[in-house]
A protein has these predicted regions:
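Active-site metal-coordination segments of metallo-dependent hydrolases
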Residues: 9, 118-127, 437-442
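Hydrophobic alpha-helical membrane context
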Residues: 15-16, 84, 346, 445, ...
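Bacterial Sec-dependent N-terminal signal peptides
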Residues: 1-25, 427
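Residue-level signature of transmembrane alpha-helix interfaces in integral membrane proteins
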Residues: 15, 19, 88-90, 350, ...
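Phosphate-group recognition and catalysis centered on beta-loop-alpha active-site segments
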Residues: 425-672
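Short helix-loop boundary/capping segments at the starts of domains
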Residues: 11, 15, 75-79, 141, ...
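Signature for phosphate-centric chemistry
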Residues: 21-155, 159-329, 333-425
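Intrinsic structural disorder/low-complexity segments
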Residues: 7, 75, 337, 436, ...
Length: 672
């Protein structure tokens, strides 16, 4: 979230035709930039403080609590080499007396940018501190009832990155100066970072990269105007700077950090407006496709905001119920989690579902996600009603939630908002049966990789134990005439899957699992000929999940080195004995019984924490789904491929659906 998704040097190698300046279409985004060209910075655009306007609350309702998520304030970027490139190339041109007055001016401005950057990437600038101080002051005077008449306690947590911590200090410091009797609880740490600033998703990034790579090829750049603007002899300048697009991109990078460094000049004036539009477009489309509810990735992106949403809801409910007394919960993080949050809520404008091309024309990036972007949820109550209302402010502007009916203006029933959030994304998850093997071999490394790339919650695969004790991945016990369980690994390994892969081992499979921590490995342990063989299979599987020992670690750090994240796995089996043994030996893992002949209550009493039954079982015993959930157990239905059955299992509320058709299941689960 801190660095841009794409290296611009690679971008310019893959762009389309270089031509003279083209006409710029009249779109909402273009009009937005013409109104204020500095907005072309997108997520490095400094905050615009606009006049505050409030719609009156329903009669008798007063604010009593604020839930807030704020992006850090203006910071330096990661463009040091770009700033130096512009400065040094123009300095060489100056030595050859090639600069126009505009070129000379740009040379000096780029030098200032480079000096202010000072090799410090991602550092909060003084402007960033001022932004949060001003936001705090505006919040304080806008909702005085929350701070002056209510509880004096404020809880604030921050991402672990310094620019967020300093932003938090700037915000809370101003509140303290305005009202010294406020009581602050400030904190930061990895457990907060996990939901404040959840990491990127490699599957989403790869899909976005492919879409943008194709889009770049359609772009036509003006490569002539910049030479006429900056140089007295364009032909000589071309010898010095042969790649006009890369050079202009470096100028664009200088321009987009002028606001954070309080440079008043509009540095975009050195570039053709059409090129500014395209640089801006490529910059924000990456964020939109990766972080918002786009038609390309929305179904993958929104679930990643759920933990943050759930945290904010639980904090608010604790205050509403009286269990906790607080005036406000303040959270300081980053742009990408912020975008995921406001899109999950479905706030008007920012959460529109667009294709790449539609977003390029219509999505207003710096309006939604400048530096210090913020969401404020203002809670209201009345002495005459138990109904709590909430108003959403996005960058201090009242925001509507089109999916819900408002009580009045931008005021919504909190219970309606919670219900909307509860149903915003499907609670039923997709498990690819034997991997996503359409076009691949079942139970192959390729099918696992495809399930990961598709964004499946989990990928199921089958494990047999060879005669010499090696766990291998294959559905049937036999490969032709070869019985896996009575054959040596060497003989099993000699066989090839339909796609040419050798029969994989569990260790090889888990190696691919480790490359994508988002997708659960659903390990089906096949029944063996004896209980002793089943115990051996359990032992070998648990061994495969142990992290590799750290090497060359000083003794005093040995305990820390062993604290590695456990593998994200689910165990399933038709063998009741295997499930019992797994539950006994690995109580921290999810274990699901497959046979379908035992009621949830009995399994729960044995310590087995899940059921994974054929969907036909749930037609006979639909009550088992709720029974399992009441006991805190998970419920999976297998193997569900037809629309009617998928809809039925979804409506029953199963937690996972195992399927050979992940595309159809996703389509049905996300029907909007």
């Amino acid at each position: 979230m801190m660095k841009r998704f794409f290296t611009w040097a690679l971008l310019v190698l893959s762009v389309g035709t270089a031509v003279a300046q083209n006409a710029v279409p009249d779109t909402p985004v273009v009009r937005f930039l013409r109104e204020n060209p500095r907005r072309a910075a997108f997520n490095t655009h400094s905050y615009e403080f606009l006049p505050i306007q409030d719609t009156p609350a329903p009669k008798g309702y007063k604010p009593f609590y604020i839930s807030h998520y704020g992006r850090h304030g203006s910071r330096s970027d990661w463009g040091g080499p770009q700033y130096r490139l512009v400065r040094d190339l123009l300095a060489k041109a100056s030595e050859q007396h090639l600069l126009t007055p505009a070129g000379d001016s740009l040379m000096h401005e780029a030098a200032v940018i480079y000096e202010l950057h000072n090799g410090m990437d991602g550092r909060l600038t003084p402007r960033g501190v001022r932004e949060h101080a001003q936001l705090a002051e505006r919040m304080y005077h806008r909702f005085p009832e929350v701070f002056r008449k209510g509880c004096k306690h404020i809880r604030a947590v921050s991402s672990t990155t310094p620019r967020c911590i300093v932003s938090m200090n700037g915000f809370t410091g101003r509140l303290m100066s305005l009202q010294p009797d406020l009581d602050f609880d400030l904190d930061t740490g990895e457990k907060y970072y996990a939901y404040i600033a959840r990491g990127e998703n490699s599957t989403i990034s790869a899909r976005t990269g492919q879409a943008l790579a194709a889009y770049r090829k359609t772009i036509q750049w003006d490569t002539e105007t910049v030479y006429r603007t900056l140089f007295t002899d364009p032909a000589e300048a071309r010898k010095l700077i042969p790649d006009a697009v890369a050079f202009q991109n470096a100028i664009y990078d200088c321009a987009r950090v002028s606001d954070p460094f309080d440079i008043p000049d509009n540095m975009y004036r050195y570039l053709p407006f059409g090129n500014v539009v395209k640089f801006h477009e490529l910059n924000f489309l990456s964020a939109y496709l990766n972080q918002c509810d786009s038609k390309l990735n929305g179904e993958l992106r929104l679930p990643r905001a759920q933990e943050l949403i759930d945290t904010l809801i639980s904090q608010a409910d604790a205050v509403i119920s009286g269990k906790v007394r607080k005036a406000a919960d303040l959270c300081f993080g980053h742009d990408w989690p912020y975008l995921g949050l406001v899109c999950y809520l479905g706030l008007e404008g920012v959460s529109e579902r667009y294709t790449l091309e539609e977003a390029a024309d219509n999505w207003l990036p710096s309006w939604y996600c400048p530096f210090a972007a913020n969401l404020q949820m203002i809670f209201y109550r009345s002495k005459k009603s138990d109904e709590v209302l909430v108003k959403f402010l996005m960058n201090e502007r009242e925001a509507k939630l089109p999916a819900l009916e408002a009580v009045q203006g931008p005021y919504y029933r909190w219970n309606d908002v919670k219900a909307w959030c509860e149903n915003r994304i499907p609670r039923t998850q997709i498990v690819a049966h034997r991997g996503y093997w359409d076009g691949n071999a079942e139970n192959s490394i390729a099918s696992l990789r495809k399930a990961q790339e598709f964004g499946c919650w989990g990928s199921e695969f089958d494990i047999h134990l060879t005669a010499d004790g090696v766990p291998v991945i294959h559905h049937d016990r036999h490969i032709g005439e070869l019985d896996i369980q009575t054959s040596a690994f060497e003989d099993v390994r000699a066989n090839r899957l339909a796609n040419g892969e050798p029969v994989p081992t569990l260790a090889e499979y888990m190696g691919q699992v480790a490359r994508n921590r988002e997708c659960m490995a659903v390990l089906e342990l096949k029944p063996q000929s004896t209980a002793e063989r089943e115990d051996e299979l359990v032992e070998k599987c648990l061994q495969a999940l142990q992290p590799a020992p750290a090497r060359n670690v000083p003794p005093e750090f040995a305990a820390f080195a062993r604290r590695q994240e456990p593998a994200k796995v689910v165990f399933i089996s038709f063998s009741h004995h295997i499930c019992q043994e797994l539950s006994r030996r690995a109580p921290g893992y999810m274990v699901q019984y497959l046979e379908g002949d035992i009621a949830p209550a009995q399994l729960h009493a044995e310590g087995i924490n899940g059921i994974d039954y054929h969907y036909s079982v749930f037609y006979k015993h639909p009550e088992w789904v709720q029974e399992a959930h009441d006991l805190g157990m998970t419920v999976n239905a297998w193997t569900v491929d037809d629309r009617k059955d998928i809809e039925a299992m979804r409506d029953l509320g199963v937690d996972q659906i195992t399927t050979n058709n992940p595309v159809l299941v996703r389509e049905i689960l996300w029907e909007r």
